[in-house]
């Protein structure tokens, strides 16, 4: 919709999307924490409280989906034989290797996918293991860790929102390159942090880098994709990101294990992925 109607605002729209997503996550987290805290004060067990948080999360999904179901207008023309055409298209993709064909034909998009895979390894590791690192390396307690998670989400929302406007002004590639430098600075700060104050700086940088890089990457996909192939391009992009969500944390864990539980070296290893991403983008 944005590509067709307002191509000059792709970054802004992407930034709004990611920023509001983080805000929604904060609201959901706040509701869950309130339920858990209240339940514990009344002597309820954690099993029932955890189940309640799942129900809350599902309810939030339902509520925020209602505007889409009720008011968003479908612009695509309905196809009489839509299901049959979908099955045919899927069979052709499998038989002809359309994904490989797209990556070979659209060189810039191929480099972006590789770049996204590398930097998302770092994003996935931060999301998955930030609390573990804070507890094991920096000695954070439960309260400090919860505050850190909230802070990272807030700065991620700010980063996504702000960089959305910035990338429309300076260009999507340059904006993404700047976010990767921000990631490298974050890792260097976190790995060298000896005090809580320095680690809080790293946490803020992580949030800014996380929101801005996700916003910039998605906008750049929209720039490279032909209008009639947007869904397919985003499918390839998301496939690379989900793969990196597995590889990143596994790499962190493997380095931690091989170095005798040295998580500082493990997080430095994650920075190598950001360097490779920056190199690929260049």
Model-identified regions with their sequence ranges:
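Conserved small/polar residues in nucleotide/adenosyl-binding loops
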Residues: 1-5, 273-280
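Intracellular juxtamembrane helix-capping segments at the cytosolic ends
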Residues: 4, 213-225
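A membrane-interface helix-boundary motif in multi-pass transporters
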Residues: 36-58, 254-272
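Short amphipathic helix-loop junctions that connect adjacent transmembrane helices
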Residues: 128-144
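Helix-to-loop junctions at the C-terminal end of transmembrane segments
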Residues: 159-171
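Structural signature of the two symmetry-related core transmembrane helices
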Residues: 174-188
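Helix-loop junctions at membrane interfaces in 12-TM secondary transporters
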Residues: 191-202
């Amino acid at each position: 919709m944005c590509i067709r109607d307002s191509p000059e605002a792709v970054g802004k729209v992407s930034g709004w999307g990611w920023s509001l997503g983080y805000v929604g996550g904060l609201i959901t987290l706040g509701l869950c924490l309130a339920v858990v805290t209240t339940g514990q004060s009344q002597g309820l067990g954690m099993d029932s409280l955890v189940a309640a948080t799942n129900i809350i999360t599902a309810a939030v999904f339902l509520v925020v989906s209602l505007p889409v179901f009720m008011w968003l207008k479908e612009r695509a023309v309905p196809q009489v034989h839509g299901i049959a055409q979908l099955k045919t298209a899927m069979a052709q993709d499998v038989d002809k290797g359309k994904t490989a064909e797209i990556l070979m034909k659209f060189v810039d998009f191929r480099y972006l996918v590789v770049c996204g895979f590398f930097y998302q390894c770092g994003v996935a590791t931060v999301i998955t293991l930030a609390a573990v690192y804070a507890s094991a390396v920096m000695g954070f307690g439960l309260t400090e860790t919860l505050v850190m998670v909230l802070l990272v989400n807030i700065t991620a929302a700010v980063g996504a929102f702000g960089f959305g406007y910035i990338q429309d002004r300076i260009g999507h590639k340059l904006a993404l390159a700047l976010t990767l430098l921000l990631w490298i600075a974050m890792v260097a700060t976190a790995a060298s942090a000896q005090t809580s104050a320095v680690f809080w700086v790293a946490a803020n940088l992580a949030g800014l880098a996380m929101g801005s890089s996700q916003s910039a990457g998605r906008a750049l996909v929209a720039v490279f994709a032909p209008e009639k192939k947007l869904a397919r391009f985003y499918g390839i992009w998301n496939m690379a990101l989900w793969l990196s969500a597995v590889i990143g944390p596994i790499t962190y864990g493997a380095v931690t294990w091989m170095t005798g539980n040295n998580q500082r070296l493990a997080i430095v290893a994650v920075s190598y992925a950001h360097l490779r991403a920056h190199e690929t983008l260049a």
